[in-house]
């Protein structure tokens, strides 16, 4: 049994073998990536634990509204090549959730650092704006640029993983990746006991964490509400 972490790794493994069982962890779109036939019935030699959770978009908006009550528009920045599920899964949910929160949804699909800068500059020029950064290899690769632009333009931004916040991002809400790794051995054991990956459903995330960088909040002039402080899993001073 092979454990594969991230979409690029699993894609490479998938090219090498269609027989050795593979259990993936932290893959955004296993169906779109061609790793499994469906979430319920993977159908091949690959199964595992995805980070996709469409309902998280509503939580993002809730957190941003708590942080910025005068919120009027929110942009989502993502790259469709590194997260095919973005357009298919996250964006429709984002647009619907925006209606509930009565904010204008803006979808920014980016493919280069220049496009990141342009999209964020346009957003920063609009009052009452905030930004959601979707997961994906592209946004991870360019996280330093995104974080620095958010700080320069004073855009309240929520990120998908803690490491964005460890590197200076304002706050993150996302899948607890360590929890996925803790759950993976169960599938490995079941496969070693004779179960087939084809019959083991792809598992969704169960545990999420909110991390807030208080130093960044002070630098940007944001007062973090007590309700967010109380609900945070970690506070970075």
Question: What are the residue ranges of the model-derived segments?
Answer:
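Short hydrophobic alpha-helices and adjacent helix-cap/hinge residues
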Residues: 1-237
């Amino acid at each position: 049994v092979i454990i594969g972490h991230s979409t690029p790794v699993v894609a490479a493994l998938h090219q090498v073998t269609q027989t050795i069982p593979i259990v993936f962890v932290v893959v955004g779109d296993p169906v779109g990536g061609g790793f499994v036939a469906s979430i319920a019935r993977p159908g091949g030699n690959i199964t595992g634990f995805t980070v996709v959770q469409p309902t998280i978009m509503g939580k993002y908006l809730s957190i941003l509204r708590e942080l910025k009550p005068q919120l009027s528009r929110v942009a989502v920045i993502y790259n469709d090549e590194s997260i095919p599920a973005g357009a298919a899964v996250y964006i429709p949910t984002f647009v619907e959730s925006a209606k509930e929160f009565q904010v204008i949804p803006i979808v920014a699909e980016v493919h280069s650092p220049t496009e990141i800068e342009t999209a964020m500059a346009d957003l920063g020029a609009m009052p009452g704006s905030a930004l959601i950064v979707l997961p994906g290899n592209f946004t991870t690769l360019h996280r330093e640029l995104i974080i620095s632009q958010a700080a320069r333009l004073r855009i309240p931004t929520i990120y998908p993983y803690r490491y964005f916040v460890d590197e200076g991002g304002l706050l993150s809400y996302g899948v607890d990746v360590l929890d996925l790794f803790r759950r993976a051995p169960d599938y490995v054991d079941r496969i070693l006991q004779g179960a087939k990956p084809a019959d083991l459903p792809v598992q969704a995330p169960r545990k999420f964490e909110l991390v807030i960088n208080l130093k960044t909040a002070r630098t940007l002039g944001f007062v973090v509400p007590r309700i967010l402080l109380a609900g945070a899993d970690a506070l970075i001073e």
